[in-house]
């Protein structure tokens, strides 16, 4: 048993049971109060005694660790408490430190059932005491805000003006030690292949969990196409699955391809990935409506949602809605609600139609069943996914005139649309629900119901007379907006940027006051050139402008409005067709849209060029002179770009790649023959490849290692042949050789895209170790598997006994590691010496010549010396004579004894 583990003592267990009992009692009382009928007020008001309690969560805790104090009042919950409204108890905690000093925590406000908890971090070693104080309370029904229409029929109205007397708890002692209390042992991040669900006990695994929700969900601040989690460092293919007919068609048509796409009628692949499932709309070429569901880890089709007729859920039942037609997936959502009585996330899918874009339909992402709809969705504003996962749209509205503006800041909220009652509003962080008829602060969307979204505003507040549009949103902090201004032959119109407060006050309400307002003069656009304002980067305090004609960029200070760097040196002429940008970790990433292939990185605060990426060229088939570069996504310090111009020729030119670039230095990490964009989730890249109209999943796959030893039982001093295989266990090419990262591109193109098998492909490094019979570990060294997946190693075991040999592949960017173990035996070598034959017969030869002593082989000698064994015919004659005399003596003695007994 580990000496570092601290187990709960029976007293502590009893304390936990007491806490649980009190909480259950409080909840029971709360339920009683909820359903208690209203009665008339008390005249005169009543007075109640009270009992205050406090319990430290841990009797013993380490210095610097967080202690939790649980406190409650030993009476019924506050009589007017109802949801977020009504009275609350308040408490103070007096903590006495070992050195005699004291500190007070509070006031601490209870929850609706009359209790609460808080944290305290001790800084001294020794015994602490804590005492809870309740200062008393006269019920008035409103410290936490009036219950709407509070009156005689309201919860607890009869208790108004009743008084609850002050009380103080007994002191409770807890001990702080120098040694820390043992915490929950965190499961290490996976080194083997993993799939969802991620066990909820693995709190520390959250950085590797990532979904692709589409829409504004992938927007990080003012930037777009961001992904969470990890991203693959290799073009290793997990699987591919047909998306449609593709590739070369028929000898009659030569090198012409199956239909892929065009400027107007394209095969659009915009997948959404939720909890290990891929959802994507049926390609336009199929001439049918609906969407597919694939398993992220295998590519297996799980479901097809047919929207050309009645919608059937995965469970086999028809939706009561009767059918959903002409719908296409628009985005996905994870709604993470932390409510008083309900906590957790809900994965949803949303669909729309071109005919009714302001009506959204919501589906259960697990069962695929239709749930409800929102009509009159706000179509204006800047889309943002809130911290709780709600889909928000921030918008500026002028309720007045241009001459006399009356400006309002609105935040339209999908969750508010489903909860709206007309009298209550949910806070943006999702802390409270106000759905009509719902008194339990729970999320319960009505099934097959259409909600009116015209009132779904979680924020609708008057603001100062600002101009322009919203540029960036930081939920619960601020919103930045403004105008671009102009600077040309007609004169200068200063631009303006401003920020409004989004922090809520103590009651949870937001008053969007003006935080700051700056003006600036944009770069000159004289001479019929186009200067465009870019993104606003509040973290680095910069905003910028770009010009496609001059291929230049200017940086401005968000604090002063002054130009702080630029213009940059003109770069790729192909920037004329567009200069899309991203801000990532203090860098301004610039792409040459459509026709150019370059990617540039500038220091966002100084304008210094950090690196420039030029795609590698193969052949001269691109009609643009180089390979176009468009952003797919940024994730895990990697920039993914693809070469897919607006117009695709038939046959398509060759040399289009999905490319992965190191965001810190612009070095190409890998590329793969792939025509089309891609998205990232759970460490995988998923994209449609127009070269063959197949869906590819790139990422780190599982591997398998085998091992054999020959012979199974060897003689000491003989060699053992250790051999085995290391193979790819990914669904797409299970059982094929595992190949080194350096050979992955060519190998994957060979396996999946009918390209030539690489002649110089190498396998992976295998480390072999042995455990000898004495328990000693021996490193047998490394060997590399070949392009067939085989490896081999010769070894001579030093001592006899049973050995265990392990072959380990530690993994690579393409594969997770694997290992295998085998046992074999080594027998002790036989002690064999050269035979010594008898000497020829001679009267002078000694009959008692000594035999040659056997030579003992050293235990660790690689080649034991033979043992000399004398032949049976060489036994000396004296030996036989001695044996005969002994027998005669024994017989004579026995006879003498027998005669003596007879005479007696």
Q: For the regions a protein language model found, what residue spans apply to each?
A:
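Enriched for extracellular/lumenal, surface-exposed ectodomains of secreted and cell-surface proteins
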Residues: 128-161, 799, 803-817
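Blade-level signature of beta-propeller repeat domains, shared across WD40, Kelch, NHL, RCC1
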Residues: 665-715, 721
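Residue-level recognition of secondary-structure-to-loop junctions
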Residues: 117-124, 128, 134, 785, ...
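C-terminal membrane-anchoring or membrane-association module
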Residues: 4, 10, 891-904
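Short amphipathic, basic-aromatic surface patches that mediate peripheral association
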Residues: 72-84, 725-759
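Repeat-blade elements of multi-bladed beta-propeller folds
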Residues: 191-216, 252-291, 313-360, 381-412, ...
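Structural beta-strand segments of beta-rich domains
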Residues: 65-69, 718-722
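Proline/serine/threonine-rich low-complexity linkers at boundaries of modular beta-sandwich domains
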Residues: 39-51, 696-704
């Amino acid at each position: 048993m580990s000496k570092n583990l601290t187990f709960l003592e029976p007293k502590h267990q009893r304390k936990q049971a007491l806490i649980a009992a009190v909480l259950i009692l409080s909840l029971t009382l709360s339920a009683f109060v909820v359903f208690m009928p209203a009665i008339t007020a008390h005249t005169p008001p009543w007075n109640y005694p009270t009992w205050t309690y406090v319990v430290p969560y841990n009797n013993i805790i380490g210095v610097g660790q967080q202690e939790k104090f649980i406190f409650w009042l030993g009476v019924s919950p506050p009589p007017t408490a109802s949801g977020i409204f009504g009275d609350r108890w308040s408490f103070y905690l007096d903590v006495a430190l070992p050195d005699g000093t004291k500190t007070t925590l509070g006031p601490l406000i209870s929850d609706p059932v009359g209790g609460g908890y808080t944290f305290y971090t001790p800084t001294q070693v020794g015994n602490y005491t804590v005492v809870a104080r309740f200062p008393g309370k006269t019920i008035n029904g409103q410290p936490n805000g009036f219950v709407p229409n509070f009156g005689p029929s309201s919860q607890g109205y009869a208790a108004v003006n009743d008084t609850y007397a002050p009380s103080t708890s007994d002191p409770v002692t807890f001990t702080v030690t120098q040694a820390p209390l043992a915490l929950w042992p965190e499961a290490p991040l996976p080194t083997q292949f993993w799939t969802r669900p991620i066990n909820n006990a693995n709190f520390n695994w959250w950085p590797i969990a990532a979904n692709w929700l589409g829409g504004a969900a992938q927007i990080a601040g003012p930037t777009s196409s961001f992904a969470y989690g990890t991203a693959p460092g290799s073009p290793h293919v997990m699987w591919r699955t047909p998306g449609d007919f593709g590739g070369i068609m028929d000898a009659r048509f030569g090198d012409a391809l199956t239909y892929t796409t065009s400027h107007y009628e394209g095969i659009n692949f915009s997948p959404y990935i939720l909890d290990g499932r891929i959802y994507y709309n049926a390609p336009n070429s199929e001439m049918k409506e609906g969407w597919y569901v694939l398993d992220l880890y295998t590519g297996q089709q799980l479901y097809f949602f047919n929207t050309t007729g009645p919608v059937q859920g995965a469970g086999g039942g028809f939706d009561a809605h009767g059918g959903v037609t002409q719908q296409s997936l628009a985005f996905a959502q994870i709604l993470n609600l932390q409510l008083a009585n309900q906590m957790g996330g809900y994965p949803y899918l949303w669909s729309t139609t071109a005919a009714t874009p302001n009506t959204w339909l919501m589906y259960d992402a697990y069962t695929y069943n239709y749930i409800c709809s929102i009509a009159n969705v706000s179509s204006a504003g800047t889309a943002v996914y809130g911290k709780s996962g709600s889909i928000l749209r921030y918008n500026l509205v002028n309720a007045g005139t241009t001459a006399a503006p009356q400006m309002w800041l609105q935040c339209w909220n999908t969750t508010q649309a489903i909860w709206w009652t007309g009298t209550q509003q949910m806070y943006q962080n999702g802390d409270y629900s106000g759905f009509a008829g719902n008194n339990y602060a729970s999320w319960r969307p009505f099934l097959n119901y259409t909600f009116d979204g015209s009132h779904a505003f979680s924020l609708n507040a008057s603001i100062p007379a600002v101009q322009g549009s919203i540029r960036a949103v930081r939920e619960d902090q601020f919103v930045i907006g403004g105008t671009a201004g102009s600077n040309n032959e007609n004169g200068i119109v200063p631009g303006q940027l401003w920020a409004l407060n989004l922090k809520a006050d103590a009651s949870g309400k937001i008053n969007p006051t003006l935080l700051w307002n700056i003006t600036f003069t944009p770069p000159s656009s004289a001479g019929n050139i186009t200067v465009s304002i870019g993104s606003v980067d509040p973290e680095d305090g910069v905003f910028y402008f770009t010009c496609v004609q001059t291929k230049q960029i200017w940086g401005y200070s968000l604090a002063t409005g002054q130009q702080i760097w630029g213009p940059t040196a003109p770069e790729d002429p192909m920037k004329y067709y567009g200069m899309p940008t991203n801000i990532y970790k203090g860098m301004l990433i610039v792409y040459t849209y459509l026709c150019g292939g370059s990617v540039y990185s500038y220091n966002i605060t100084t304008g210094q060029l950090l690196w420039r990426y030029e795609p590698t060229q193969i052949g001269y088939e691109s009609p643009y002179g180089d390979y176009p570069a468009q952003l797919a996504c940024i994730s895990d310090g990697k920039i993914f770009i693809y070469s897919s111009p607006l117009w695709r020729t038939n046959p398509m030119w060759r040399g289009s790649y999905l490319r992965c670039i190191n965001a810190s230095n612009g070095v190409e990490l890998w590329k793969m023959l792939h025509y089309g964009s891609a998205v990232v989730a759970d460490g995988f890249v998923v994209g449609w490849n127009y070269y063959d109209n197949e869906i590819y999943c790139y990422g780190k796959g599982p591997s398998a290692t085998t091992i054999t030893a020959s012979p199974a039982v060897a003689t000491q001093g003989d060699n053992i042949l250790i051999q085995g295989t290391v193979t790819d266990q990914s669904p797409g090419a299970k059982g094929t050789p595992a190949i080194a990262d350096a050979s992955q591109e060519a190998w994957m193109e060979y396996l999946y895209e009918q390209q030539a098998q690489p002649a110089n492909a190498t396998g992976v490094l295998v480390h072999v170790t042995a455990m000898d019979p004495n328990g000693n570990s021996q490193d047998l060294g490394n060997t590399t598997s070949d392009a067939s997946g085989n490896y081999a190693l010769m070894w001579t075991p030093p001592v006899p006994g049973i050995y265990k040999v392990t072959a380990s592949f530690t993994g690579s960017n393409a594969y997770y590691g694997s290992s295998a173990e085998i046992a074999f035996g080594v027998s002790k070598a036989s002690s064999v010496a050269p035979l010594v034959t008898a000497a020829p017969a001679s009267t002078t030869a000694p009959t008692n010549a000594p035999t040659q002593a056997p030579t003992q082989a050293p235990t660790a000698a690689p080649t034991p010396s033979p043992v000399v064994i004398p032949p049976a015919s060489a036994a000396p004659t004296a030996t036989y004579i001695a044996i005969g005399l002994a027998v005669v003596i024994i017989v004579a003695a026995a006879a003498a004894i027998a005669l003596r007994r007879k005479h007696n």
